[in-house]
Each structure stands twice: as structure tokens, then as C-alpha cells.
Curated annotation (Swiss-Prot):
Family named by the database record: Belongs to the ScpB family.
Subunit structure: Homodimer. Homodimerization may be required to stabilize the binding of ScpA to the Smc head domains. Component of a cohesin-like complex composed of ScpA, ScpB and the Smc homodimer, in which ScpA and ScpB bind to the head domain of Smc. The presence of the three proteins is required for the association of the complex with DNA.
Record keyword Cytoplasm present: yes
Keywords: Cell cycle, Cell division, Chromosome partition, Cytoplasm
Keyword Cell cycle: yes
Protein name per the record: Segregation and condensation protein B
Role description: Participates in chromosomal partition during cell division. May act via the formation of a condensin-like complex containing Smc and ScpA that pull DNA away from mid-cell into both cell halves.
Compartments, as annotated in UniProt: Cytoplasm
Main location: cytoplasm
Example of a GO cellular component annotation carried by this entry: cytoplasm
Compositional bias ranges of the Acidic residues kind: 172-181
Organism from which the protein derives: Listeria innocua serovar 6a (strain ATCC BAA-680 / CLIP 11262)
């Protein structure tokens, strides 16, 4: 691969990693390059993003990982994008992700990924943007992954006074408690939506 192709791969990997970001160790392993090459590529990509005011993204280094982020100058437009009327329907993926966070909080994105069996970066971004979920600190240790919890807006949206009002699991010993969590959550969500429409 030439340098431009490597930069394209790096950009794709950073995009796919989302808020979790990538360490240089991960980049060297996935891209099969040296540590110095990874740092050089990151520096080049940083110059392209951070050195160009017309670009919408920047490359950040946080807690030993690198991630793409939107520029603060565009915050007003991003806010307009995510301001959604209360009757907006969440996707199935977002609802499943929200149910997992609600029942297991505080929880990392990787833990949510494990329960769902797929990456949940997109749904989590949507939930954060809608104010239903927020990050509340980071785990100790390598990677310092964000911990996600639900917000007071989540309680309001679902007609709950507190997390204690979440539907209890019918059978915690069931073979698939994760599916039970989601089914109960969807039932509660549908009930709250029906009440809003009446």
C-alpha cells in the first residue's frame, strides 16, 4: 500500500472505532505497520484535519487513543441536526442499545457490543445526541473506555420516576435474560407512546 492508501485505511479504522478510539498498538497490529509508521500516519492525518479550517473533523488524542471528532465551530449545526421532536421513533438498534444501558449501567460500549453481538457506536451516538444517554467517567486501566448511563431525559421520555421503576425481569435465571430485558423495555416504550397519542 502506498501512503495515501494507508491514510485511507487509517481514516476508515478511526471512523469505525468511534468514541472508543484506537491506540497505536491497535493500528500497528491491524495495519501491519511499525509503531513509527503509525505515528507518522497519525501526524499526517492530523495535519490534514486539524490544519484545514474547512474540514469538519479533527483528530484527537485522548487517554492514549486517537479518535475523530467534530469541530466545536460546527456545534450549532450539529445541535440542529439532533434536536428531534419527542414523538420521533428510535430505531430497533437504538432501542436495544438503550435497554442494555438502562439495565446494566454504568456500562462501556464494548460491553453493550458483547450483549448485542454487533457494534453499537452508531446507536450510542444517536442516544447521546438525543439526550437519553450520557457518558459518566471512564473505566480504569488500558483504553479508559467511557462508561454510559441513562439521563433524566430518559426517565421523562419513558414516564419513569427513577430507575427503580424499570420493569423487573420476569425470570432472572432465564437462558436469555438480555432478550427479556429488551422485550420488557420495548413493551414499556410502546405503552408510553400509546399514552402520548391518546
Amino acid at each position: 500500500m502506498n501512503r495515501e492508501e494507508q491514510l485511507g485505511v487509517l481514516e476508515s479504522l478511526l471512523f469505525a472505532a468511534g468514541d472508543a478510539g484506537l491506540s497505536t498498538e491497535q493500528l500497528t497490529e491491524v495495519m501491519e505497520i511499525t509503531h513509527i509508521e503509525a505515528l507518522n500516519l497519525l501526524e499526517l492525518l492530523s495535519e490534514r484535519y486539524n490544519g484545514n479550517e474547512d474540514r469538519g473533523l479533527i483528530l484527537l488524542e485522548l487517554a492514549g487513543t486517537f479518535q475523530l471528532a467534530t469541530k466545536k465551530a460546527h456545534a450549532e449545526f450539529l445541535r440542529k441536526l439532533v434536536e428531534v421532536p419527542s414523538n420521533t421513533v428510535l430505531s430497533q438498534a437504538s432501542l436495544e442499545t438503550l435497554a442494555i444501558i438502562a439495565y446494566r449501567q454504568p456500562v462501556t460500549r464494548m460491553e453493550v457490543d458483547e450483549v448485542r453481538g454487533v457494534q453499537t457506536d452508531g446507536p450510542i451516538r444517536t442516544l447521546v445526541a438525543k439526550g437519553l444517554v450520557t457518558d459518566k467517567g471512564r473505566v480504569d486501566g488500558a483504553g479508559r473506555a467511557k462508561l454510559y448511563v441513562t439521563t433524566s431525559e430518559f426517565l421523562d421520555a419513558f414516564g419513569l420516576n427513577s430507575l427503580d421503576d424499570l420493569p423487573k425481569l420476569a425470570d432472572p435465571e432465564a437462558e436469555d435474560p438480555d432478550q427479556s430485558e429488551m422485550d420488557l423495555f420495548f413493551d414499556r416504550f410502546n405503552q408510553s407512546k400509546e399514552q402520548e397519542e391518546e
